[in-house]
Amino acid sequence: SWNAALALVCGNSVVWKPSEKTPLTALAAHALFGRAVKRFQDEGGSVPHGLATVLIGARDIGEVLVDHPMVPLLSATGSTAMGRAVGPRVASRFGRSILELGGNNAAIVTATADLDLTLRGIAFSAMGTAGQRCTSLRRLFVHDRVYDSFIPRLKKAYASVSVGNPLESGNLIGPLIDKAAYDAQQSALSEAKAGHGKVFGGERVDAGFGKEAYYVRPALVEIAEQTGSVEKETFAPILYVIRYSDFDEALRLHNAVPQGLSSSIFTNDLREAEIFLSVRGSDCGIANVNIGPSGAEIGGAFGGEKETGGGRESGSDAWRAYMRRATNTINYGRSLPLAQGVTFEVE
């Protein structure tokens, strides 16, 4: 919805096609927009008809927008696979696209980290919204000196977190969106086990809503190598934990995935923090220090690198992508100045 707001502020009309899995949030946001428009009109303002429209439907509706010549700019949020299909199709008609794609986000816990702060940051980033944020934490690299003291504390947090109806007070973990998300989680955990990973959690939970409700305990996987499912984004609460002993090794592992959305480091070493934020460090579009990778950093440019797509929303430059830019030169005199002082005399 923030993409739609940016486009509107820049003077565009907007057609919003939400995921077919989450139509109600789009309709709710659109209803709020309708109330704002009505208030503006009641006070004498004028709003063009059809300024904002919500289209509810499946993939075929999205494909119409992708291919339509009257959609000069398409902002798409989704998987990397979706971006691979959408980007070239929009470009083939010389349209523009902003792609916000998959994220396999990581955090590094160094030997100097404040472990109390780190525990809270990791727990929220990895378990919040049942791991269904594009910026959810999915990989964790923990220094050898603090691994054996920190990971048991993290497991305790995983074991104690409440799973159930998110509308009830006290529940922190709600359901997965559907069976496909549950199957993806279980498949990733099976692959991790086959790769000698130690899985803690990940079981299905009966929250009293029947067999079509997919509540699960968040999973923590201790694994020696970053291969297989660790290199992919699984949109579910799975946190892969890898031990490291050298800071350069942690940076190499951190960057050794195709995605590049969000990242973080927990450290009290200024040099490590500065390196992480430099060209030698995180190769992601978002890099944080002593706070997790998740959240809506509305004040800063939001987006990633590599297979995350390179698009940016929010922040001070967000408006640029939603405007058609033109360079204008106006001559108010009676002489004709030419570029670079060129002389071109004719009679």
Where are these regions (language model features)?
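Rossmann-like NAD(P) dinucleotide-binding subdomain of oxidoreductase/dehydrogenase enzymes
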Residues: 1-117, 244
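Conserved C-terminal structural/oligomerization subdomain of aldehyde/semialdehyde dehydrogenase
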Residues: 42, 46, 71, 108, ...
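Residues that line or immediately flank small-molecule/substrate-binding pockets and catalytic motifs
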Residues: 56-59, 78, 144, 268, ...
